[in-house]
Amino acid sequence: MVDFYDELTYETNPFPETHPGNLAALGRLFGIQTTSPQQCRVLELGSATGGNLIPMAWHLPQSEFVGVELSAAQVDIGQRIVSTLELPNIRLEVGDILELDAARIGQFDYIIAHGVYSWVPPLVREKILQLTRDCLTPHGLAYISYNLLPGWRMRGSLRDLLLHATREVTGAAAKYNTAIAALERLQQALQGAAADSQHYVQKEITYLLAAHPSYLLHEYLAGENNAFLFSEFLADAGRHELQYVCETDLHTLFDTTLSQPAQTALADIEDPLQHEQWMDFVQMRAFRKSVLCRADLPLERAIDIDVFTAYFYSANLRLKGKENLNNTKPVLFLTADNNELSVTHPL
């Protein structure tokens, strides 16, 4: 797999949900006295070229960052960026997750594994959870993203197609071109299709045709691509003395994201984790970004709204219409996905 990465490095960008400031705030909502992002240690497994970790190191100079990546070519790119920026608080190193020694790398307040867990074999997944258990500080948090059942089965049909279409093709560029041709053929074949499942596939094809080549290759043509039920992930984490805290998309924990009939149907499920599992089935969810902590850490599952008064908030908003911001009338703003937010004090 590393040769494939070396041939076409994975495009890495900052993932805001993995930022220690975001993780720290989420932990506080559930009663965890998380370490200040201004002075913490962060480990990223599968850090690629450092596109996620380097901006954190730049903005949090008193914190320490360590990235571990299997591909020497990607680490070399990242190290050159670190050198150019003269960042003393980040270290990117070539390493195999299976060979990482928890005693050597030490403990971390925040551990990140984005786009790794579903794309490695079982032994590596076990080692990720083992390292998380052994390397987390007592109040530390880990972020792990993974493909999710049942929703991933729909996307998996496209993976089946692309693996079939490229089965006799070698080289990253040739595989990519062949995959694009296959997607375009299927897109043409589905014109005028009426089934909801076909509409879903059409939407995914449109996304993949516009995506960065590295995403298509590493997401859909990688040797490993596994999806799990939420309950399966919880069981695996539990075996390693880890427990689930929440999702980085906090709103997905609440049934207000469901239709009224769905809320009614699930209303008698008292266990919050079983309720989340059922929400996955109802929504056909395909991806999760889960936050874990040590199993011996007490959590406050009932979020107290007063906790929110201790935080500052920021959002990517745009003004709806041409409101006058010089008065105290509520003003409507739009989020990036066009949801409305009413603000009483817009300035």
Show which residues each predicted segment covers:
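Conserved SAM-binding loop of SAM-dependent methyltransferases across substrates and taxa
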Residues: 49-62
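Rossmann-like AdoMet/SAM-dependent catalytic core
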Residues: 194-347
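Conserved SAM-binding strand-loop segment of SAM-dependent methyltransferases
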Residues: 86-97
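Conserved alpha-helix/loop element of class I SAM-dependent methyltransferases that forms part
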Residues: 7, 11, 15-40, 55
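Conserved SAM/SAH-binding beta-strand->alpha-helix loop
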Residues: 71
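Conserved class I S-adenosyl-L-methionine
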Residues: 144-171, 175-178, 182-193
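A short acidic, Gly/Pro-enriched loop at the edge of an enzyme's catalytic core
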Residues: 102-111
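A short glycine-rich, Lys/Arg-flanked "PGG" loop and its adjoining helix->strand segment in the class I
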Residues: 126-138
